[in-house]
């Protein structure tokens, strides 16, 4: 029994904070190099970070722990960092097929991979094989509606329709918040509730980017009304986000009155 618990703990710890952060940074860097639209970038992040990595942990038997049908491939055994970087590019490829009329070509992804994947050059055939493995691992779960960015974009559109204050809210700040949360291992759980995260990110971005003297719109009550989440639930996530996106000294002295929004 103790051995089983040890195996489960070891599996749940994979890939580890530093390795996961490097992989997310790799995908973000690739997104910049490819000049992806935000919806493609965040769909790829959702596919890779929220679906592939947890599914690999369950399926591939790290430290002997398996869950569901095993997936076998030379890309998974051994599972090198270069192979995981290939899967990150495959996530981008799949996302572009969903959202773009002219998806990224495998040749363009291979060319980028040759420049930014260390220690390994993958062929176009490898990319095609990796796509099949990716789909098997995530069990073809590539729906793109239930992601935080989609909800965030919808909320911001609604906000701007009912208040001019919405024009002061910077979407770049919203996206920077999502990037930081993706890079941080201990905040990745927030993406398990994408709609709640989107609502909380909007409130956080409002507090950060809208001048305090313009805090005339009741953003928190409006968000809770629109999403049906309790104010307390939203504020807990907002404070969690602020702890990650602001430096500790910027958080000092911020009581609830500072977030009376």
From Swiss-Prot:
It comes from Oryza sativa subsp. japonica (Rice). Disulfide bonds: none annotated. The keyword Cell cycle applies. This is Cyclin-J18-like. It holds the Pfam family Cyclin_N. It comes from the Eukaryota. Gene3D superfamilies: Cyclin-like. Belongs to the cyclin family. GO terms for molecular function: cyclin-dependent protein serine/threonine kinase regulator activity. GO terms for biological process: cell division; G1/S transition of mitotic cell cycle. Keywords: Cell cycle, Cell division, Cyclin.
């Amino acid at each position: 029994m103790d051995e089983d618990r040890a195996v489960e703990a070891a599996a749940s710890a994979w890939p580890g904070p530093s390795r996961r952060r490097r992989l997310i940074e790799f995908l973000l860097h690739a997104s910049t190099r490819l000049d992806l639209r935000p919806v493609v970038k965040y769909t790829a992040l959702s596919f890779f970070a929220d679906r592939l990595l947890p599914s690999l942990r369950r399926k591939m038997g790290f430290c002997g722990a398996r869950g569901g049908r095993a997936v076998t491939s030379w890309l998974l055994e051994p599972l090198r960092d270069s192979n995981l970087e290939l899967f990150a590019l495959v996530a981008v490829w799949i996302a572009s097929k969903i959202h773009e009329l002219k998806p990224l070509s495998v040749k363009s992804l291979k060319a980028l991979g040759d420049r930014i994947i260390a220690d390994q050059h993958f062929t176009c055939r490898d990319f095609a094989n990796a796509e099949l493995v990716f789909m098997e691992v995530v069990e073809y779960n590539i729906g793109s509606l239930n992601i935080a960015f989609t909800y965030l974009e919808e909320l911001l559109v609604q906000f701007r329709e009912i208040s001019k204050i919405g024009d002061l809210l910077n979407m770049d700040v919203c996206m920077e918040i999502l990037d930081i949360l993706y890079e941080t291992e201990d905040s990745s759980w927030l993406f398990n509730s994408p709609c709640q995260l989107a609502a909380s990110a909007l409130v956080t971005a409002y507090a950060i980017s809208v001048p305090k003297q313009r805090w005339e719109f009741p953003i928190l009550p409006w968000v809770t009304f629109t999403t049906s989440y309790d104010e307390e639930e939203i504020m807990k996530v907002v404070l969690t986000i602020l702890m990650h996106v602001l430096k500790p000294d910027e958080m000092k002295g911020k009581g609830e009155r500072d977030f009376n929004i």
